Regions:
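Active-site-proximal substrate-binding core of FAD-dependent oxidoreductases
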Residues: 374-376, 433-457
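C-terminal segments that line or cap access tunnels to active or ligand-binding sites in enzymes
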Residues: 247-249, 257-405, 416, 420-423, ...
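Short hydrophobic core segments
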Residues: 7, 31, 245-259
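Dinucleotide-binding Rossmann-like beta1-alpha1 core, especially the glycine-rich loop
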Residues: 47-123
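Glycine-rich FAD pyrophosphate-binding loop
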Residues: 21-45
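N-terminal Rossmann-like FAD-binding beta1-loop-alpha1 element of flavoenzymes
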Residues: 2-30
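Active-site/ligand-binding neighborhood in enzyme catalytic cores
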Residues: 92, 109-110, 114-235, 246, ...
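A conserved FAD-binding loop/helix module that cradles the flavin
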Residues: 410-432
Length: 457
């Protein structure tokens, strides 16, 4: 029996283990249901191509996270990239972000967007949903031509039922001067937004990050251990393979809705009903490798219009040329759906339609496709609806009362980055240490590199 059991050996779970060890605490075990650690940060090497679960790109704006990366691996192991992206709509490419780059669109679309921005509902005090939030900050025209169709595709949900609390740093705001300048001339906005610059491993795909963290952590995950029940009265976890283990505290990075269905013996009897209310969409990521040396110099392109089944298409060879064979190129495409409303047959048809459309858009024949790898993300984007907003905090508090700290992107049921996943694991370990060690806390580390220095590289 270990005092602490960590469920899930993705980035958050491994981060918790790493930070326990950094504090000198080793009375814990990690359990992972898959055949290897990593979760969605696994990479696949196929015939000279490297594919990830969509575009997992590393964004660094936290000093501790910078020091963490430089400790478990090295920034020298990463390529630093300045974003080169576009939006494809109305049969043409325009720069991203949309709200600052209307130049190149049809004149009537530009007029509609500017008029909508000038007459936007800025006086709306508290937007009730994402639809109203767009009307308040961007106006009806920009909503019509980008924000509503694109976000409807990526979330696969009604924009009037999605709350705007997820937007934060992910949707850059604008002003009238920026809108007008971006309408009449092409501007360089590559430095706008949280993803204006990113890091990506020179070799090994994004799994390099997981492998580095595994090497830096002495404790190894016990693989092929899928949780089926957590009895909070007897403090016993039962796994699908028949194994059981006792615990004092749990750090769970499992999807929150699944976790709630596993908990037994709690005084909080509403867990099962709550699990049904938590919504999250799914994404199919199709990866294609081509026997063609050049496609585009962009890193990815957004497709807001309905005629394209995918909402985004990225280009692996531009993110890292070593991701493909010499003289070849590769893409990733993403399309989302709400799992409860989509049968397996419908999903398969949707993916095949998306692949066929992607080849047409790129002007590539089926004969030029040398490799294909479809990856399914059963959990992709959490839906920020009214039920989540009202009940999530209490759910997490009740689980904590039952001895379960649920954290990470899906454990915390939120939209977050790899940086936040690592910090979530760090915080989880720090929260539990006093329970076993009194007032002792994690050893402080001196950051070898600051974010300011990183951005100067």
């Amino acid at each position: 029996m270990a005092n602490v059991v960590i469920l899930g050996a993705g980035l958050t779970g491994l981060s918790a283990a790493y930070h326990f060890e950094q504090a000198g605490f080793t009375d814990f075990e990690i359990f992972e249901m898959n055949e290897e650690a990593g979760g969605l940060l696994r990479s696949f090497m196929i015939d000279g191509f490297t594919f990830d679960y969509t575009g997992h790109l590393l964004h660094i704006n936290d000093e501790y996270f910078a020091s963490f990366i430089n400790t478990i691996t090295s920034l020298d192991a990463f390529i630093k990239v300045t974003r080169n992206t576009a939006i494809y709509s109305h049969d043409r490419f325009t720069d991203y972000p949309f709200q600052m780059n209307l130049f190149g669109l049809p004149y009537d679309v530009i007029y509609e967007c500017i008029e909508g921005y000038v007459n936007r509902r800025a006086g709306l005090r508290t937007p009730k949903n994402f639809y109203e939030w767009v009307l308040k900050y961007f106006g009806a025209g920009m909503g019509k031509h980008f924000f509503f169709p694109y976000n409807s595709k990526i979330l696969a949900y009604d924009m009037r039922k999605v709350l705007p609390s997820w937007t934060g740093r992910f949707v850059p705001k604008t002003n009238l001067e920026a809108v007008l300048k971006g309408a009449f001339e092409q501007k360089d906005t590559s430095n706008i937004g949280y993803n204006s610059q990113f890091f990506y491993p020179k070799t090994g795909g994004i799994q390099h990050l997981i492998k580095s963290l595994e090497r830096a952590t002495k404790a190894k995950p016990r693989l092929h251990h899928k949780v089926v029940e957590i009895d909070v009265k007897s403090k016993t976890i039962t796994f699908a393979n028949g194994a059981t283990t006792r615990y004092e505290s749990i750090i769970s990075t499992l999807p929150l809705n699944e976790l709630l269905t596993m908990v037994k013996g709690s005084s909080h009897r509403s867990y099962g009903a709550a699990a049904e209310k938590l919504l999250c969409n799914s994404v199919v990521n199709f990866n294609l490798g081509f026997n063609r040396p050049k496609l585009t110099d962009r890193h990815w392109t957004y497709y807001p219009e309905k005629q394209y089944p995918f909402y985004r298409m990225g280009f692996w060879h531009n993110i890292n040329p070593t991701s493909v064979k010499p003289g070849h190129t590769a893409i990733y495409g993403e399309l989302s759906y709400l799992g409860k409303n989509t049968s397996k047959t419908a999903r398969t048809a949707l993916v095949e339609s998306a692949v066929a459309k992607a080849l047409i858009v790129l002007g590539i024949s089926e004969q030029e496709v040398v490799v294909r790898k479809d990856l399914h993300l059963a959990y992709a984007y959490v839906i920020y609806d009214a039920w989540r907003e009202k009940h999530l905090e209490n759910l997490l508090k009740n689980l904590a009362h039952d001895g379960i700290l649920s954290t990470g992107r899906y454990g915390g049921w939120k939209y977050s980055s790899m940086q936040e996943a690592v910090i979530d694991g760090k915080i989880a370990s720090e929260n539990l240490l006093p329970k076993f060690w009194g007032a002792q806390t994690i050893k402080k580390q001196t950051p070898p590199t600051t974010v300011k220095q990183i951005n100067a590289l």
